[in-house]
């Protein structure tokens, strides 16, 4: 784990967030390991097992992201602004999107 340094005197909330972030790092690392091993596997059955394990780790990472979104307002704000939108990711992050592609409604834009 790369986040072994913990500041003294942290609040319980900060410790919980640290644990979630450290766990997320570990899940992402495991996803990468399984993905690499699957990519070079020459045995079809082993590849299936590795893909299954990788996808389980993706589920774990998604659960941690959802916990962070619920508990950390900045995660909630940024995830709401950026995730599940179409168009250029940098433009979305800069707020350069129209109402038609903000993930709400039918994507018809302004009908006036």
Where are the regions a protein language model picked out?
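Iron-associated oxidoreductase/ferritin-like identity signal
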Residues: 1-112
């Amino acid at each position: 784990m790369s986040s072994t340094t913990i500041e003294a005197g942290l609040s319980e909330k900060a410790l919980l967030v640290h644990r979630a972030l450290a766990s997320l790092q570990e899940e992402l690392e495991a996803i990468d390991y399984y993905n690499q091993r699957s990519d070079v596997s020459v045995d079809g059955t082993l590849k299936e097992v590795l893909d299954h394990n990788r996808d389980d780790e993706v589920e774990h990472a998604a659960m941690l992201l959802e916990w962070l979104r619920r508990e950390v307002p900045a995660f909630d704000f940024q995830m709401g602004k950026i995730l599940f939108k179409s168009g250029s990711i940098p433009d979305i992050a800069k707020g350069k999107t129209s109402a038609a592609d903000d993930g709400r409604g039918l994507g018809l834009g302004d009908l006036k």
